[in-house]
Amino acid sequence: MFRPARRVSWGTWIFAILVLLLAGGAVGAFLEVVLPQRVASLAQSEGSELALARKGASDVSTAVGSLWTEISAKGGIGLSADQIVRDLALAKATEKAADDALGHVQAAETYMAQADGLPFQLHSPAFIAADRPALQHLDKALQAAIKLTHAATLQLTLAQHLIQDAQKISGTLDPSLGAKSWTDAARAASELATDLKAQQAPVSDPEALLDPLWAKWVDAMLAVVTSAQQYSLASAAKQTQQAQQASNSLAAARAQLAATYAAAQNGAAAWQAKAVQPLLGTVVKEAAAAGA
């Protein structure tokens, strides 16, 4: 049975038109009012984070330069105990400051991503193109600074430990040998040998940016305490021939210890130029390019 199509009432048409007008008005209000306000708010937040990142990068750049100027003179292990304590505190504080500044960079990038992801935009907000290069430069500067401060922390912590071992040799082992207190000397040598063997891996850690010449110094120090232990044990057992051989080995090891220490100190400048200066240059160059 044929049924004619139902006619849509004028009321329905009017309601539909009103809905469309309201929807269009809402979209227009979003485009004209809400969207610009949201973009402006994100731009302001991003700008604040960028300013904090620039300030942090500037402070970090200055601190890193000061830190490595002192370390570079003789290498971390060549510093005095007081210098090591002071520089280690500076390295840890600067590494934290660099991490904080990098956090501001990442926060600024998050605000950029939020602004770029807002709907109904024909193009990205202007502040993104203006600030993105600066954030990229800051990221590079701070990443290099973190490598340097982390290396300084590792190197100075190791230096602190090795200097204590060197002091034990001169302050405990050598007096025991001189007094022919063979049991005390053998015990001290054994403890030092165990400790120095544990330091051979850290001293070769590439993240510490430590000159490989210092690893040779650690090996020479280990040779000294090993020879001292053999000398003490042979002397205690009254094994004259073995004691003489160990004494000769000990003298040779001491000479090698002095030679490797001098070589590491003399080579400090060349090593820093090769391993450290490029990173320092990156920090300074990238921070300057970012306006820090």
Task: Map each language-model feature to its residues.
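Leu/Val/Ala/Ile-rich N-terminal alpha-helices, chiefly Sec-type signal peptides and the beginnings
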Residues: F2-H150, A255-G291
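Extended amphipathic alpha-helical interaction segments
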Residues: S124-A255
